[in-house]
Design a protein with these regions (language model features):
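Glycine-rich nucleophile elbow surrounding the catalytic serine of serine-hydrolase chemistry
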Residues: 150, 175-181
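Glycine-rich "HGGG/HGxG" loop immediately N-terminal to the catalytic nucleophile
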Residues: 133-141
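Gly/Ser-rich "nucleophile elbow"/oxyanion-hole loop immediately N-terminal to the catalytic nucleophile
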Residues: 73-82, 157-177
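Catalytic-loop region of hydrolases
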Residues: 1-78
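Alpha/beta-hydrolase active-site loop
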Residues: 114, 142-163
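Short, surface-exposed "cap/lid" segments of acyl-processing enzymes
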Residues: 59-122
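Structural recognition of the beta-strand scaffold that forms the well-ordered cores
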Residues: 54, 85-88, 125-130, 172-175
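Substrate-binding cleft and catalytic face of glycoside hydrolase catalytic domains
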Residues: 94, 131-134
Length: 181
């Protein structure tokens, strides 16, 4: 059907803005918390594919915010139950937009490659939020635990809503530094 999730999310990938415009959200920000606004292919991985997503979350004041995230989807078909999601709260990479995990190449550093590969082999969908204001317009919510927590939870919801992930509702959250408080 024309409005099936496959067509909707496929169109989002095909029509996501290119270059730095990817991180500039539409106004007003559509949908509900955890909805994917748009996505684009980022890289082929050992055992999966990485995408960049822009999704809806909420500011520390309860206002709608677009937040970017990196999502890795395992190759192949999941079990009939779907795939679990691991929402990973990484540490601070810096305060500028260019330091956001989705912009800096952080998710491809050698120190975490083995972990990503192992999780993909175990059929996990992995999502890592940039957090409010990191990579996207607005103030970076650094040390605002309530906003960061919402961003990490909404990233998990976005992974579940991202049709290519074929994720189920089983969600695991881990983090350290700013992503763990």
């Amino acid at each position: 059907p024309e409005n099936s999730p496959e067509n909707i999310f496929g169109a989002l990938i095909d029509t996501a803005p290119e270059g730095l415009d990817f991180w500039i959200p539409p106004d007003p920000i559509p949908g509900r918390n955890g909805d994917v606004i748009w996505a684009r292919h980022d890289a082929d991985l050992e055992g999966g594919t990485a995408y960049l997503i822009l999704y809806r979350s909420e500011s520390v004041c309860g206002e709608p915010r677009a937040v970017s995230a990196w999502i890795a989807v395992p190759d192949g078909e999941p079990s009939s139950l779907g795939r679990p999601v691991l929402s990973w709260g990484h540490g601070t990479r810096g305060a500028g937009d260019h330091c956001a995990a989705t912009r800096s190449g952080y998710m491809y550093q050698e120190e975490i490659n083995d972990l990503i590969t192992e999780l993909l082999a175990r059929d996990f969908v992995i999502v890592a939020s940039d957090y409010e204001g990191s990579g996207t317009p607005g103030m970076y919510a650094w040390s605002q635990s309530s906003a960061l927590g919402k961003n990490i939870l909404d990233a998990a919801r976005a992974a579940q809503n991202f049709n290519l992930a074929k994720a189920n509702k089983d969600t695991f959250i881990t983090g350290f530094s700013i992503g763990g408080h």
